[in-house]
């Protein structure tokens, strides 16, 4: 056997080698060596809602961070808010757009929060995700670039870029075709300026003294020479800022969207700038693909109002299940997060993995077991597999129980009877998700799932033999309900009544659904009646 094949087989056998995050962690260690600390980075401009597409980058880094820590490595996980970027477009999901319009071309930290909740527009979007990440077990160190630039932290990095602007120009040209390359006579400045008077970026650099002095003019009429050691309005453009910060923070891993990691994209040019200007080898990277919503094509854009953010997803998916979606999908694979009937399948898949991990279900092979175990481990909020298997009840069953008990979680848990105290918190989170899905998603995507028991004394329009048959179910089947060991016994008892009376069994079942929930169909009737219970059924059917 070749050494390569042997390594591949070992990776399948070892649970800490079979996941893509583990393979990436090994690559980082192999390429960067044994370090005192490994800095892994992520970041975004808070120009709008931080949606699930953005979250994919965050959790991709988190999974690799966990894999490194599982190898005993000290890891620093930084998340940069690029909040000194320009406010370029008014999003559709913020109030008072006419006010925001006035702040176009300002730094986004200078744009007001028109909801009046936070001190500025950028902070509004930062807070939204910062408060949610702990719910899914993600705890990065947040870096605020506006504060850092205004504190003149990057003075030397800007100076080096200005002094080597011709080299940077060559780096940028390297991946451009002839039609788009900058010409030798073209003026290029790696630094951009926010005007010291009007605060907009409507400026043009007119001179540089070779050290710290940059002269500029603004469309507002302001002209000045600024010393970047004290001036607060200078910042590097994206393609230079990114590699400058790699060196500043000593970043060894940072993924990128497929638009950045494409050949000749911003990562390729940043890699050149990082090495040639800042003498720092670019971090190991990996490409992550877009996240779609089922039925909504294309990349989600936070400049549009129709976005799904992390708290929206956590309304429907308990944290472990949401992590499972990302941990179980390779980052370079485009996938859709669904809020329709597929939600039930996602929960079923997670529960199946959980049963395999605890030996309730048997995996097809050791390789499959190791893979499922690692995905399950990475799906847990704290990264640890619970000592005992969590209480399992299907999402589908919860939707039925919750509607029977009008969303009362305490009554649902009481009806289950065998929930241990240590499992209750996790179960309650699943209950909350199931109830939200029934109230907000199911009416559109699965109306047949929605029902309400007739507890108000109302009656279905039954007559003749069908009315008699329903009464017989009440008088003959309900008294024996607690003796039935299986759902099919309840079904058979009703089928026998229909046969004896010469009725179509399906028509009797339809009549029972009408009597119970005012619908022609619903959950499987025998199981449904056993869940509702004899006393509640007797109360509903007593009006006939």
Ranges and model annotations:
Residues 138-310:
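Active-site cores that bind ATP or allylic diphosphates and position pyrophosphate for catalysis
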Residues 69-87, 278-295, 506, 522-544:
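Glycine-rich phosphate/pyrophosphate-binding loops
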Residues 2-95, 243-266:
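N-terminal catalytic cores of NTP/NDP-binding nucleotidyl/phosphoryl-transfer enzymes
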Residues 1-35, 50, 76-77, 169, ...:
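Basic, alpha-helical terminal appendages of large translation-related enzymes
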């Amino acid at each position: 056997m070749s050494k390569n094949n042997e390594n591949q087989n070992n990776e399948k056998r070892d649970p800490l080698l079979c996941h893509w995050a583990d393979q990436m962690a090994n690559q980082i260690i192999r390429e960067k060596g044994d370090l005192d600390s490994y800095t892994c980075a992520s970041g975004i401009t808070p120009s709008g809602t931080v949606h699930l597409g953005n979250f994919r980058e965050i959790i991709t880094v988190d999974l690799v961070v966990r894999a490194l820590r599982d190898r005993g490595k000290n890891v620093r996980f930084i998340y940069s808010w690029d909040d000194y970027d320009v406010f370029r477009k008014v999003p559709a999901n913020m109030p008072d757009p006419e006010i925001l319009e006035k702040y176009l071309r300002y730094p986004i930290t200078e744009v007001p929060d028109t909801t009046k909740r936070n001190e500025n527009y950028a902070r509004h979007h930062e807070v939204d995700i910062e408060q949610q990440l702990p719910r899914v077990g993600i705890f990065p160190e947040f870096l605020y670039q506006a504060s850092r630039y205004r504190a003149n932290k990057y003075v030397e990095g800007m100076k080096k870029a200005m002094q080597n602007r011709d080299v940077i120009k060559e780096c940028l040209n390297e991946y451009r075709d002839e039609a788009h390359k900058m010409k030798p006579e073209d003026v290029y400045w790696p630094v951009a300026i926010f005007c010291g008077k009007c605060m907009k970026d409507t400026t043009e650099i007119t001179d540089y003294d070779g050290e710290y002095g940059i002269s500029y003019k603004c469309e507002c009429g302001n002209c000045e020479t600024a010393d970047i050691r004290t001036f607060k309005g200078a910042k590097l453009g994206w393609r230079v800022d990114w590699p400058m910060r790699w060196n500043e923070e000593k970043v060894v891993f940072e993924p990128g969207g497929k638009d950045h990691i494409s050949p000749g994209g911003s990562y390729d040019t940043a890699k050149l700038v990082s090495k040639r200007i800042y003498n720092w080898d670019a971090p190991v990277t990996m490409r992550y693909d877009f996240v779609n919503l089922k039925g909504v094509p294309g990349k989600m854009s936070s400049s549009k109002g129709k976005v799904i953010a992390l708290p929206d997803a956590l309304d429907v998916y308990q944290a472990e299940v949401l992590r499972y979606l990302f941990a179980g999908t390779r980052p370079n694979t485009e996938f859709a997060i669904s809020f329709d009937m597929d939600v039930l399948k996602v929960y079923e898949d997670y529960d199946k993995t959980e049963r395999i991990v605890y030996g309730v279900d048997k995996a097809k092979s050791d390789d499959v077991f190791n893979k499922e175990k690692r995905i399950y481990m990475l799906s847990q909020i704290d990264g640890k597999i619970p000592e005992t298997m969590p209480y399992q009840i299907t999402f589908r069953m919860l939707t039925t129980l919750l509607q029977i008990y009008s969303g009362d979680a305490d009554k649902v848990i009481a009806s289950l009877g065998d929930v241990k105290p240590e499992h209750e918190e996790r179960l309650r989170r699943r209950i909350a998700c199931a109830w939200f899905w029934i109230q907000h998603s199911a009416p559109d995507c699965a109306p047949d799932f929605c029902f309400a028991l007739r507890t108000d004394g109302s009656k279905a329009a039954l007559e003749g033999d069908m009315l008699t048959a329903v009464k017989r179910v009440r008088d003959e089947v309900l008294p024996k309900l607690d003796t039935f060991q299986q759902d099919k016994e309840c079904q058979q008892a009703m089928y026998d009544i229909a046969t004896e009376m010469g009725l179509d069994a399906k028509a009797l079942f339809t009549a029972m659904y009408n009597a119970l929930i005012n619908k022609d169909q619903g959950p499987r009737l025998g199981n449904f009646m056993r869940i509702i219970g004899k006393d509640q059924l007797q109360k509903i059917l007593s009006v006939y």
